[in-house]
């Protein structure tokens, strides 16, 4: 196996057809009639998607760790495994009317990088890890970015476990039901650096004929629960004073 110092890194290219095939296969799990995907977090479809992705990782020789909030970490060993890993990843849960690429691309692109390194016999200095984060979308359970939020200590595991969907099912119960409640404490996982590849979800790059961009900032989100007190009335003819 060669080290990165022994190759011309500018000539290293992934197998685009293989990545595309993986994206299309994952998109069949929860496929909608209009070409989108509905694969809500911690459903049976989410389990199928997780199983498929982890199966690909194992085929690529990666080892798997699942933490207590269901985040998945797929690891390719490096030459110096005492170093914290270089991590990439995203999520594979979707909105009810989601697409094929949001989140999924970030996870599968990471696996494709590992496949390419394997194909070329390249050994990296530090380990490489690919992650998928639980309930990024927040379309079934709130808050959004739950798995990464617990990992980063933005809120507690107990708070996340107690969240329920519209049917009263809890995050903890659903993690247990689909078999993805791991043993590792969230956050007890060192990271040397983290990169996330993502679709733009907008027209700017295409409009400027640019292939790739680097994100310098993202939209911040806050949720508020409000109680409105008053009397129902027609908005047009009803004076506020009355």
Language-model segments: residues:
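Short alpha-helical patches at coil-to-helix transitions and adjacent helical residues
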Residues: 50, 85, 103-111, 145-148
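Generic secondary-structure signature for well-ordered alpha-helical cores
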Residues: 3, 24-31, 58, 62, ...
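Short coil/turn connectors at secondary-structure junctions
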Residues: 60, 81-86, 123-128, 189-192, ...
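Alpha-helical metal-binding/catalytic segments enriched in His/Glu/Asp
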Residues: 26, 88, 98-137, 222-228, ...
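Basic/polar N-terminal segments that are highly enriched at the extreme N-terminus
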Residues: 1-14
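Acidic/His- and Gly-rich active-site-bordering loop/insert found
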Residues: 13-99
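Midchain, well-structured core segments that form catalytic/ion-binding scaffolds
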Residues: 135-136, 140-242
């Amino acid at each position: 196996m060669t080290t990165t110092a022994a190759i011309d890194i500018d000539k290293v290219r992934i197998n685009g057809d293989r990545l595309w095939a993986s994206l299309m296969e994952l998109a069949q799990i929860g496929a909608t009639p209009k070409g989108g995907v509905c694969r809500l977090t911690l459903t049976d479809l989410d389990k199928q998607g997780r199983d498929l992705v982890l199966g690909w990782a194992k085929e690529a020789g990666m080892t798997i760790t699942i933490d207590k909030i269901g985040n998945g970490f797929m690891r390719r060993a490096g030459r110096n495994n005492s170093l914290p890993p270089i991590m990439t990843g995203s999520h594979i849960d979707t909105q009810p009317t989601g697409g094929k690429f949001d989140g999924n691309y970030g996870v599968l692109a990471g696996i494709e990088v590992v496949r390419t390194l394997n194909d070329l016999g390249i050994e990296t200095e530090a380990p490489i890890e690919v992650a998928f984060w639980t309930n990024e979308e927040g379309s079934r359970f709130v808050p959004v970015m739950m798995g990464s939020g617990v990992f980063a200590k933005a809120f507690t595991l107990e708070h996340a476990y107690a969240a329920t969907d519209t049917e009263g099912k809890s995050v903890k119960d659903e993690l247990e039901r689909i078999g993805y409640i791991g043993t590792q404490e969230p956050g007890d996982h060192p990271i040397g650096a983290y990169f996330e590849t993502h679709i733009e979800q907008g027209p700017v790059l295409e409009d400027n004929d640019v292939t790739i961009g680097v994100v310098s900032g993202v939209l911040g989100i806050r949720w508020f629960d409000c109680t409105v007190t008053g009397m129902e009335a027609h908005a047009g003819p009803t004076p506020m004073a009355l």
